[in-house]
Amino acid sequence: MSEKSPPRTILQMLGAVGEAQVQQAVRLAAQSLAQLGAAWVLEVSHMGYLFGLFDALGVPENARPGLLEKLREKNAHELRRAAQAAGLDAAGAAALTGLLELSGSCEETLAKAESACRNDRMRAAAAELRALAKTLEASGGAVRLDLSLAGEMEYYNGLVFQGYLQGLPRPLLKGGRYDLLMQKFTPGAGAIGFAVYLDELDRLSAPTPPVQRNSTDRVMLNVALPKGRLGDRMYDLLARIGYGCTEDYNATRKLVVENPAAGIRYFLVKPSDVAIYVEHGAADVGIVGKDILTEASADVYELLDTGLGRCRMCVAAPADYKDDPSRPVRVATKFVNIAKSYYASIGRDIDIIKLNGSIELAPILGLSDVIVDIVETGTTLRENGLRVVTEFMPISARFIANKASYQFKHNEMDAMLEALRKTLQEETK
């Protein structure tokens, strides 16, 4: 049975689509948001600017979808690695990660974007954004340019935009120009439109939980911290840069601790649940291992690799193991999605055996050929007669953010991130 599409209202302009139609569609998107909520943000980007930069840097076609994915995640550290893997030099990788800095108010961001143009395609996109910004000056809410906002490259070819209402955990409105799709049906035709996702509106009527009602006018950042050593370590770091609480964090049995004067509220949650709390907007930001984040495929921004808790995801097997390509590999793991993705990337058929603990026992008892698991020192593997066959994913603690919260609390998040980066850098000197 196919998955049902969420209920939505759609506006489309098809056929002869020019500058006037594009501006009208985006104005209607802004007006729709204004009718639905008092506090709103319309985030705008342009695929032509991104494609123009890809062209200027000589990015291979097959590498572009992966780079766009890292841009959408605001994942600077992995974007840099992916750019280098695509053959870009350090300057090219820096140009791509520089797109993440092209975010903010229209005037300030446009000035930076225009000065960074390298070819006519980028200049044409910047000019279209400049004209659009002028028409939206009196729109009321907040129109932000964010040139890391990227649509699917086989679908969108021009402006792309998303709309947020305060209090909703994900975009309420999504749209853009999609001539490429339209021309599959009508050669030469253009198309622009947007959808408003009606199921999200139901959340606006839900009452705010008492624990999240602010006792001060100061904006509060809600932080999901994992219980255990990683959470304790992160709290100590955040407390050192001004985000501590008056009560003893290490002694309390409370699951919520806060300091309104510092604008901070912590939720203490199971490590595997951090990404869920952040994705669904119960927390604005959180600290989570890359293994958990990848396994859950959480739709969040990955803003910082803290470097804490470093280890790696590996394929391990008995010392005498030899792969038999004539049959699927039997893989024991608790990271089912990660294992499937890795083996799909190398074109190998597998049979998954999901386990929840003592993964090393599976090949010893003949339950599996190999395991996919986290390896830190390798001691447990060696003590059980296993060896690492392949290391395929570095793991560490990542600072993640809810996409909607980022629109309304980006100043507070950026301040925390800047202070945290400095502290982490000082510790590694």
Label every PLM stretch briefly:
Residues 42, 145-147, 268, 352:
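A structural preference for short, hydrophobic beta-strand core positions in alpha/beta folds
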Residues 14, 28-39, 56-60, 70, ...:
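Mid-sequence acidic-hydrophobic segments that form the walls
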Residues 11-20, 39-41, 66-70, 116-123, ...:
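Flexible, glycine/proline-enriched loop segments at strand-loop-helix junctions
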Residues 5-9, 45-52:
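Short, conserved phosphate-binding/catalytic loop or strand-edge motifs used
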Residues 50-141, 376, 385-387, 409-428:
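Long, charged alpha-helical interface segments
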Residues 6-10, 39-41, 158-160, 191-193, ...:
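Broad gene-expression machinery/nucleic-acid interaction feature
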Residues 216-429:
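Domain-level signature for soluble enzymes in the chorismate/prephenate branch of the shikimate pathway
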Residues 1-38, 82-216:
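Positively charged, Gly/Ser-enriched RNA/tRNA-binding surfaces
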